[in-house]
Amino acid sequence: MTWKDIIENEQQKPYYGKLKEEIDKRYENSIVFPEKQNIFKAFSLTKFEDLKVVILGQDPYHGIGQAQGLSFSTPSNIKNPPSMVNILKEINDDLGKKSVCEDGDLTPWAKQGIMLLNTILTVEQGLAKSHHNLGWEIFTDNIIKYISDNKENVIFLLWGSPAISKTKLIDKNKHFILTAPHPSPLSVYRGFYGCKHFSKTNEILKKLNKEEIIW
């Protein structure tokens, strides 16, 4: 199965028809991020068969030009948002070297088998969580469950309560789950700094004889 097959299967379900209708309407009548062609970018950059790691975000950044369809990531010409700054600092502290993604564009991670998935895939300009409860959560919950059921030894990095609440969808006997507070300035000092998820992920991959991530 490819992501295309998996997504098309979801698109046949009744909830998705309602979701698509609502999202199409909002793209028509207001400013919505990311650009429509980037909604499923996380799926196009990380092939299902190459999947090693899932990093769950919440909804896309809601500032102009920030969202690009990958959780936490921004285009390289955009100033790094605070959460991204904190992620880069933790990588530096954890690994003793700078990230390959200092510019905030996490595309190199996605190409190494890291799925950067938001649980809500669209948002209106300036309005965080404005597309909450339209149906995206059903879609992404089903994607997480599909990964859990059909893959083995995927490492899930769950940062913050909303992401950690998805633990129930993941088979802990087949997969690895690392949790920490969210990297936002509000919670970064509650345990995101010092979580060492980047070195821990590579330790797990090494034990599995898989190629480590160049963070």
UniProtKB/Swiss-Prot annotation:
GO annotation (BP), single: base-excision repair, AP site formation via deaminated base removal
PROSITE patterns to which the protein is assigned, alphabetical: U_DNA_GLYCOSYLASE (PS00130)
One GO CC term on file: cytoplasm
Annotated keywords: Cytoplasm, DNA damage, DNA repair, Hydrolase
Subcellular compartments: Cytoplasm
Reactions this protein catalyses: Hydrolyzes single-stranded DNA or mismatched double-stranded DNA and polynucleotides, releasing free uracil
EC class of the enzyme, as a word: hydrolase
E.C. numbers: 3.2.2.27
Superkingdom of origin organism: Bacteria
Cystine connections: none
Molecular function terms, GO-annotated: uracil DNA N-glycosylase activity
Residues forming the catalytic site: 59 (proton acceptor)
Transmembrane segments: none
Function recorded in the entry: Excises uracil residues from the DNA which can arise as a result of misincorporation of dUMP residues by DNA polymerase or due to deamination of cytosine.
Family classification: Belongs to the uracil-DNA glycosylase (UDG) superfamily. UNG family.
UniProt protein name: Uracil-DNA glycosylase
